[in-house]
Amino acid sequence: MVATCNNGEILHVLFLPFLSAGHFIPLVNAARLFASRGVKATILTTPHNALLFRSTIDDDVRISGFPISIVTIKFPSAEVGLPEGIESFNSATSPEMPHKIFYALSLLQKPMEDKIRELRPDCIFSDMYFPWTVDIADELHIPRILYNLSAYMCYSIMHNLKVYRPHKQPNLDESQSFVVPGLPDEIKFKLSQLTDDLRKSDDQKTVFDELLEQVEDSEERSYGIVHDTFYELEPAYVDYYQKLKKPKCWHFGPLSHFASKIRSKELISEHNNNEIVIDWLNAQKPKSVLYVSFGSMARFPESQLNEIAQALDASNVPFIFVLRPNEETASWLPVGNLEDKTKKGLYIKGWVPQLTIMEHSATGGFMTHCGTNSVLEAITFGVPMITWPLYADQFYNEKVVEVRGLGIKIGIDVWNEGIEITGPVIESAKIREAIERLMISNGSEEIINIRDRVMAMSKMAQNATNEGGSSWNNLTALIQHIKNYNLN
């Protein structure tokens, strides 16, 4: 089935993903979903980012016949002083590189604008961190759809913090809890858990803070906003947020699960560790394995990694601990443990097939940094969580898990400004206590209830993406809105 405009031409949507795996994976999956509905989908990115998912897109064309393609723009490596191949925040190998990548983004704006003018799409589906796309959409008289990574609850929290400013009350101590006013639930925070932009005065604003202000302005000027969530996870917040925002809002998540129904579960298919991980999981008992991953960007000090390793070892719980590709392990990792499947646990460097791990019957828990994708993937496959938020919006994402009763907390109170984790080191005893509480206390009423709730939510997530489900219908409605825009 082909989606056409009023002039008989196939509806053409251009997708512009941000240069970070946590952002580009769901947005590329959104492009695949549109293509599966007969929409011509063009993904605009840089060469080395395209390599990560090109084989999946090629198979979508070759096997499924989808009208989807990738167009690349040269990344300005030499101009910003980066080695060839470093084109995303995940590939950065030093603290200085993210700043250079941000600079590169500003240099990419003009060539991207020129390419969009050349391609003449009927709609731009843009990551939130490309606020300038609202201007090019206005110039071309086409709708701009903004992709927001987080759940409605998270954005409702952020909105109400900015409006009501409960964290600005006099004499509020860093360790004191306060309630965020006006929300459907009583949600509490400590000042130390808030993102830096909320705690700074206006004269302390950084370049990134200014970008966030541009993002907020572009939201108001966009035709609509898409969230990677599903109605049944947060019905009160879907309704609440949609009343707050002027642009229309849609949600057709979980995108990872929705897209897996097309053909391939994993977007990034080239995992060197696939066979090691799957063979090892196949040898474990059902629900016995703790999966530990803090994303591909966070940089823990060796002292913290050592505490985590000690806790995992002492708990006697089988585990998979995923480390960054260039993580230095010599000083803290027990000798012989790296990728040694004869051990009770696996330490794996680099990318792993996370969706496959989540779906495996041996996986019984997930220690997570509360990245948006990770939380949603755990919910989708019914895996209860141990939450350990670090930076960005992760303390807000933790509230989704807390309010819905889908896991337990390590108890982190300090937000980090960047990917270099400098907060207080959490001792192994505290980490071990959380691991054993979730993984060994399976007979306790608390853990039984958590597992029941997350399994029920998993069924709702999967039903939402079935034909006639809430997310399926939202995707259908969005495509129709874009068609109607082009009729006017």
Curated annotation (Swiss-Prot):
An example molecular function term from Gene Ontology annotations: UDP-glucosyltransferase activity
Reaction(s) this enzyme catalyzes, per UniProt: solasodine + UDP-alpha-D-glucose = solasodine 3-beta-D-glucoside + UDP + H(+); solanidine + UDP-alpha-D-glucose = solanidine 3-O-beta-D-glucopyranoside + UDP + H(+); tomatidine + UDP-alpha-D-glucose = tomatidine 3-O-beta-D-glucopyranoside + UDP + H(+)
Residue sites binding UDP-alpha-D-glucose per the record: V352, Q354, H369, N373, S374, E377, D393, Q394
Top-level division of the source organism's lineage: Eukaryota
Enzyme Commission number(s) from the entry: 2.4.1.-
Active site: residue positions: H23 (proton acceptor), D127 (charge relay)
Any matching Pfam family: UDPGT
Gene Ontology terms describing biological process: steroid metabolic process
Binding-site positions, an anthocyanidin: H23, A392
Transmembrane segments: none
Induction description: Induced by wounding.
Tissue expression pattern: Expressed in the shoot apical meristem (SAM) and tuber.
PANTHER family: GLYCOSYLTRANSFERASE (PTHR48047), SOLANIDINE UDP-GLUCOSE GLUCOSYLTRANSFERASE 1 (PTHR48047:SF150)
Functional summary from the UniProt entry: Glucosyltransferase involved in the glucosylation of the steroidal alkaloid aglycons solanidine, solasodine and tomatidine to produce their corresponding glycoalkaloids.
Family statement: Belongs to the UDP-glycosyltransferase family.
Protein's name according to its UniProt entry: Solanidine UDP-glucose glucosyltransferase 1
Organism: Solanum tuberosum (Potato)
